[in-house]
Structures are given as C-alpha cells and as structure tokens.
Amino acid sequence: MSLQFIAGGSGSGKTRYLYEKVIKESEEHPDIQYLFIVPEQYTMQTQKELVRLHPRHGLLNIDVLSFKRLAYRVFEDLGVQLPQVLDDMGKSMVIRKVAGKLKKELKLYGGHLEQPGFINQLKSQISELCQYGVSVEDLAMVEEETDRVLLKDKLGDLKTVYGGFKDYIESHYITAEEILDILCRKLPQWEPLKNSVILLDGYTGFTPVQYRLAELFMIHSREVICCVTADPREMLYKECTMQHLFYMGRHTVCRLRKMAEEHHIPVLKEVWCDNRPAWRFKESPQLDFLEQNLYRYNGKIWKNDPQDIQIFRGKNPAEETEYVCSCINEKVQKEGMRYRDLAVVTGDLASYGKEIAHRFDEAGIPYFLDDKKSILENPFIELIRAALDGVKDASYESIFRYLKTGFVYDETYSREEAQVLTTGWKTMQEPWGSKAGKTGI
C-alpha cells in the first residue's frame, strides 16, 4: 500500500510518463493488474494510446476504466443485482410527476413547472445534490439557518421536491449517481483489487464519493498513483485559497495525503514533470512561455515576434468566422494539415454556433459541432405536442402550430388563420365541429 503523485504543468508530459511507466512495469510483472481510472470520455483515447505505445500492441494486464465502468465490473464479478437505474429522461419524468402532485406546497416553483427548461434545471440540481451526497435533512438545516426570505423559500421548495423524488424512487429505482455509493460498499469484497495498481489520470478534482473510492483504493490495493496539475515552482503539499491558479490540484493532493496519513499509508516522493519546453509545446517556445507565465503577474514578456499567437479583431461574429474559415483553408491547402487536426473554441456557442455552421457549410469545411440539440426543436416533435394540446382545448395557438409544422401543410390555412383572427376565435371548449357553421372552418 502506497500513494504517489505525478505532478507538473499543463502539457508537461505527466500522462506520457504514466503510460511508459505502466507499460514497462506491466511487462516486468505480468501477475499484477494495472487499473487505469480516467474520466468516461477519455477511456477510448487512453486505450488507443496505450496500445500504440506498447511493444506488443496489446493490453493483457492493463485495464482502462472510468469509475462507472469499474462499478459494473465489480458488480458483475460479485453477482450484485442493481435496481433499475434512472437515466436523465427518467429523472425528469419522475420530477415532473412529483412536482405536479406537490404543486400547492411549492411557494416559488409552483408557478414555473410549465416553463420550458425548468424541469431540466431542477433535474440537474437534484443530480448534483445526489452526486455530492447532500440529503433532505442537510437542505432543511440550511433552510433553518438562513434569514433571507427568498433563499429560504427556494430551499424549502427544493427540499420538498427532492424529498418527494427520494420517496418515489425508494426501493424501486436508483439514480446514476448512487451507483458509486453502492460500489463503495462492495469494493472491499472484490479480490482482484488486492493485487492491483490503481492509476488516476485526467481528473482536476474528485467528488465526495470519488474521494471515498480513492481512500478504499489506498487501503486495499498495492499502490495508487495520481496525476495532478501543479506548478513546480510552488509547494505541492500546502493548502491555498480558492482564487489560486492551481487550487484544485493542490487541494486534491492535500486531501489524498491526509487520507493516507490517517490510515498510515506511506506517501512516496512525488515525480515532477518540468522539462522545458514542455512536451506538448516542444515545437512552439512561445506557447510554452505563455503556459509558464499566464496569470502569474510576474511582469515577464516575450521579446521576439510571437508568430504562433495571432489576434484578429472582427466587427461581428460573421467577420470573425469568415477569417477562421480562411485560416483553416490555408492550413489544409498550403501546410498539409487535416481538418481533424484543427479545433475552433468559442466562449459563446449559442451566438457563434449557427454562424460557424453556416460559414463552414458554405466553405465546404467538414465539422462536428459539440452542442446538444433540444428534441423540442424537431418539427415532428412539435407536431405531436401541438396535436396533444389541440385535443385538450383546440386553441388557436395549438391548431395553427400543428398546421405550420409542414407535415400537414394546407395552402388554405393562411386564409383560415386570417378568418379566425377576424372572428376572434381563441379556443373551442365544445366538441369538434360544433362551431364549424359559425366560423366556416
């Protein structure tokens, strides 16, 4: 049992060092299992890179897992039967039902349940409460302590919905966030862990339940190695304020070290990856200089012409996007780069996304837009929703929303809409056709 940190700045080669270390040790000790724990979105890339670097181009005693995939591996080996897991859509449906039943008890939220996006926001809030282990009692305690009326009402409503949600799913369902809680209870029983080396990479910090798992790793496995982003010019084991540039990395180190000391687990000397220029920026000293001095406020400046960093000022998003298109075409046509090697990063995807998509389509540039599309924007979904609303009361809005989706187009609907507006017809509470003679529709 031991704990070791691999530290360094961004792009300094921490992950590459870890890959090479694991590959070498896995060949020397084929009887030991190496568990690479990375965020879900990095599992495939990590596997691909390890296979590429491995002399035999295969992984026999190295497993790349996320916390969630590790949970399912453990449950499968131990024969643990899980209740049905609620996904995001399931949670939204349960919250909508529970909140609807408790509507009269909600002081602030009651009037917003029909507002588009409100249930989704409430679902995200409840998911975060589950993820960080906040109970209904914790919310009640904070509600009692605060003197701010608006905050008290919000906490009260959240407590009511959260409590109703918990009661509804009890003994029938579990949320995805609760899977790791079950893993914490079952992990000590998993025999393969005792002969495993755990490697944590790609995390800027951990949630409370992930810290509990890291603690179990330290207690029951052979060794835990964790990569953290930190500045080699600063003290790694000293706590700092939240405003500090490397607060998250140093906080993670201090918390894991404290856990190790509580269980009398030795903390090995850390490995610093601080070669200059950094591995990621070895082709660009300017970017390496920027990584070393950005937000440091030390007064250092780059004295030469920064050819690898350019600033363009456009009048509007269209002009900016047009310039980006020209840069991409130049990189591909003159410098031999491929489209997959290029990325466009924006801080306001809502404003720039449509403009970028439009310009890229015009220029014939293939792209993937990392944006989640709402299903409500689909015209067929709008057709179904309008039809259901129309069955309720046949209101003007629902009927003409239905007609304007394009699936049931009737060239006479414009004339009919004008006639409806003229007669002032808003809704039809009576059965279909009862007013047909009066309105002519």
Model-predicted segments: where are they?
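Polyanion-engaging groove/track-forming segments
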Residues: 1-441
